């Protein structure tokens, strides 16, 4: 007799829901409306972003697309550089050895408690950090790690806060504020008064508000309670002295001062500064990771864990773009290994599509990605899978299967393989139909889907609602 209201992006939960409320149409200021209210079956027919993905009109990754810029899987060849980890036995890991191909998207999969985080966070990451002379805790028990010389660095991109100061914001994090300060320094009034770009810094210099030091807030320590940030009473949160705010630049039909620019969302800024190449180049990585709804001056401590993780990714994209532009080489001689722990948590289908495009940018210039992931769109699009299990806890810690997604999909005892097969049926993905054409006819798909769901248990969907939707999809 209870009622459940769930914020969810997993299609299995959506299919099982009795009622769907779809918010949008866009993120941030472009959202805040109910764009659909009804059943999941009706949502699939509705022309909303969520409906487009649930119905298959849009796909997070179209593996068969030949369009320029489309995701492409990278084959693992015999000469592909690899990391070799031998004898990992930390916590429940059962003396496992594995090869990890580099310059590829590698997903570590498996049920909860199967040893994924232990493998990445307790063994692999500390061992690599120690190899590069970085401060880290002692690596978990293992025999040896080989192949790290193929890399120039390793970065673990987690959801921890980027910083604790309110002065740090998305614009400064990716280097866009430097370019914007240069624009203000060229304004007629700034040149008349002799203001340089440094005058428009909120981190240093005498142009910032002397009361709050350029943060726009006063920090009040509450001892045993969470600290409180109060809007600065002198600058009213605008960060700068009044005379600095008199300097304006004209963009489109707006005359903007520095405080006005910091209040722009990234989406608004890319439109207003479309003709300013340096600003646009610096902001583009934030757009690429799907954070164009945040404000340029939003303090980074106020970002969620997922937003902080994506902003870190945007920072690496910006850094990679600058390095590539300076060296004029499209491919890094020794790439960086990026480690992610469930980066799709809390993301919509469309956000995941943007995230995958950002991943592709890193791969295209020679970097490597290892991702702990449960999202089936990401798993099926990866270049290599390492499936842990078979169960959790003491019944896990083994490598059930490793290889391409197609290899794992066909593995008889892999929960991930079973989930991939089930997902292909539910979403009407061609790969399942192609591998079953000779032994399954179209009228038997609903029966096949029912059998898969019975066998999977908690691996994918267990309610009757997805089954009814599957039948409606495949029965005449």
Residue positions per predicted region:
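Conserved phosphate-binding elements of NTP-dependent enzyme cores
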Residues: 1-436, 448, 466-476
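Arg/Gly-rich low-complexity intrinsically disordered repeat tracts
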Residues: 440-460, 468-471
């Amino acid at each position: 007799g209870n009622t459940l209201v769930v914020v969810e992006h997993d299609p299995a939960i959506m299919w099982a829901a009795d009622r769907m409320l779809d918010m949008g149409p866009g993120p941030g200021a472009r959202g805040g409306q109910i764009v659909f209210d009804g059943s999941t079956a009706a949502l699939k027919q509705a022309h909303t972003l969520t409906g487009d993905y649930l119905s298959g009109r849009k796909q997070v990754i179209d593996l068969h697309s030949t369009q320029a810029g489309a995701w492409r899987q990278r084959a693992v060849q015999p000469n592909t550089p690899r990391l070799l980890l031998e004898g990992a036995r930390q916590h429940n890991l059962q003396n496992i050895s594995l090869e990890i191909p580099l310059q590829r998207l590698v997903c570590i999969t498996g049920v909860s408690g199967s040893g994924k985080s232990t493998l990445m966070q307790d063994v692999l990451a500390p061992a690599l950090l120690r190899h590069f002379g970085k401060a880290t805790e002692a690596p978990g028990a293992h025999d040896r790690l080989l192949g790290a010389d193929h890399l120039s660095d390793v970065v673990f991109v987690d959801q921890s806060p980027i910083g604790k100061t309110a002065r740090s914001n998305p614009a400064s994090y990716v280097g866009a504020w430097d370019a914007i300060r240069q624009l203000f320094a060229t304004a007629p009034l700034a040149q008349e008064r002799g203001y340089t770009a440094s005058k428009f810094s909120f981190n240093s210099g005498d142009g910032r508000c002397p009361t709050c030091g350029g943060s726009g807030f006063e920090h009040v320590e509450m001892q045993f309670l969470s600290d409180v940030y109060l809007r600065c009473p002198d600058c009213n949160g605008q960060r700068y002295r009044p005379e600095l705010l008199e300097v304006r630049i004209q963009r489109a039909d707006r005359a903007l001062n520095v405080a006005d620019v910091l209040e722009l969302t990234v989406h608004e800024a890319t439109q207003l500064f479309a003709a300013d190449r340096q600003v646009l180049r610096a902001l583009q990585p934030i757009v690429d990771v799907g954070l164009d709804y945040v404000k340029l001056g939003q303090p980074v401590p106020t970002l969620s864990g997922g937003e902080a993780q994506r902003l870190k990714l945007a920072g690496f994209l910006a850094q990679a773009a600058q390095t590539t532009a300076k060296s004029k080489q499209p491919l890094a001689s020794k790439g960086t290994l990026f480690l992610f722990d469930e980066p799709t948590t809390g993301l919509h289908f469309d956000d995941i599509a943007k995230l995958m495009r950002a991943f592709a940018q890193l791969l295209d210039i020679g970097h490597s990605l290892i991702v702990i992931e449960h999202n089936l769109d990401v798993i099926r699009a990866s270049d290599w899978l390492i499936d842990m299990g078979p169960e959790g806890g003491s019944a896990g810690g083994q490598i059930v299967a490793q290889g391409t997604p197609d290899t794992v999909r066909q593995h008889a005892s892999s929960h991930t393989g079973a989930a991939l097969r089930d997902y292909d049926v539910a979403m009407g993905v061609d790969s399942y139909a192609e591998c079953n054409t000779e032994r399954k006819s179209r009228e038997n798909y609903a029966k096949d889907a029912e059998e898969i769901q019975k066998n999977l248990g908690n691996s994918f969907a267990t309610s009757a609602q997805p089954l009814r939707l599957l039948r409606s999809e495949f029965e005449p």
